[in-house]
Amino acid sequence: MKFYLVGGAVRDMLLGITPKDKDWVVVGATEDEMLANGFIKIAANFPVFIHPQTKQEYALARSEKKTASGYHGFEVNFSKYITLEDDLKRRDLTINSIAIDQNNKVIDPFNGQADLQNRILRHTSIAFIEDPLRVVRLARFKAQLSNFNFSIAQEMLALIKELVKTGELNHLTRERLHIEFVKALNNPKIFFTTLKELEALKIIFPNISCFLPLIPNKSFFENPIYKGSNINEKITLCLLKIPQQQLDDIRKEFLLTNKHYKLLKASIAISKILEDRSITAEEIFQLIKNANIIRDKNLFAESLNLYKKYLKICDTITPHRNYQLLQTTINTIKNASIDSLTIKTIPKDKLRNTLKQLKL
């Protein structure tokens, strides 16, 4: 059996990036032989193994044949007679179809190194269009590698636009799209605009297609403050200007977790309260209550700090109200034990006056 380093790790190394993970392909081996050599199988129906010492992933070389719609519709062959080139040929892009053998020799049957040097994203074979997920992965790679300014090969653009017309993208699951979105958080604006260029955005993320101008520009995501944020924060910073009434649709579209949703909802409420000149005292009260930032002090602190972070990155927005007064207002509402009542039923006491001050 022979072992080859493959895929993203090789691509990143050739670009001068330290790879986060290393994946290996094994040629000339069977599942039983892998187990006999101490490898640990990690998938019941798929011959992928963990190395007993390095804990890195090793997969048997395979070929694929399209048999049905969607990205699950493939017949996979793991025969020990599958060659390295067979395995590399099934991969999506030439830059991901490069291998390094145990003697550190680069094996590049599809000229991926030339495409790396020329910053071109190109399909390895016509089989690219057999898997609709690869359209989303292409946009994600463009976002992930945004520092290198890759462009998409013209012949590939034409190929993808034909694929979009077939309806294959409708078979993608929200779970898989969520994973790709999170991986694209390096620069989601590039991710979305690339999908739009591929005529796929309206199909995959129809709500974002309507609100694409509200996603910050590319330079926003290149800011060190954004880059140093965690995933929850990046999702909120990306979607902060989406209208409050669209949040439930956005939540379904991206399959956001409860934590993502609560932080996003609270941050959008704070943004609207502090920036909107025309908002009424009643609307302020409802936003504060509905965002659950009265009861949850940690949520309020986290979302307010995140909004401040957004302002630092933008460096062009000046809130019309101050943070301290917002905190005072929330404390006043909490102490008044208001729940189902609206502000219109509240006498002109400290609560109403504080809300009116905040409105001003």
From Swiss-Prot:
Sites where the protein binds CTP: G8, R11, R91, R137, R140
Transmembrane regions: none
Binding site for ATP: G8, R11, R91, R137, R140
Keywords (A to Z) from UniProt: ATP-binding, Magnesium, Metal-binding, Nucleotide-binding, Nucleotidyltransferase, RNA repair, RNA-binding, Transferase, tRNA processing
Binding-site positions, Mg(2+): D21, D23
Keyword Manganese attached: no
Catalysis: reaction(s): a tRNA precursor + 2 CTP + ATP = a tRNA with a 3' CCA end + 3 diphosphate; a tRNA with a 3' CCA end + 2 CTP + ATP = a tRNA with a 3' CCACCA end + 3 diphosphate
Top-level taxon of origin: Bacteria
Record-linked Gene3D superfamilies: Beta Polymerase, domain 2, cca-adding enzyme, domain 2
Cofactor: Mg(2+)
Recorded GO MF terms: ATP binding; CCA tRNA nucleotidyltransferase activity; magnesium ion binding; tRNA binding
Single GO biological process annotation from the record: RNA repair
Entry's EC annotation: 2.7.7.72
Cited CDD domains: NT_ClassII-CCAase (cd05398)
Record's function text: Catalyzes the addition and repair of the essential 3'-terminal CCA sequence in tRNAs without using a nucleic acid template. Adds these three nucleotides in the order of C, C, and A to the tRNA nucleotide-73, using CTP and ATP as substrates and producing inorganic pyrophosphate. tRNA 3'-terminal CCA addition is required both for tRNA processing and repair. Also involved in tRNA surveillance by mediating tandem CCA addition to generate a CCACCA at the 3' terminus of unstable tRNAs. While stable tRNAs receive only 3'-terminal CCA, unstable tRNAs are marked with CCACCA and rapidly degraded.
Similarity comment text for this entry: Belongs to the tRNA nucleotidyltransferase/poly(A) polymerase family. Bacterial CCA-adding enzyme type 2 subfamily.
Note: A single active site specifically recognizes both ATP and CTP and is responsible for their addition.
Protein name: CCA-adding enzyme
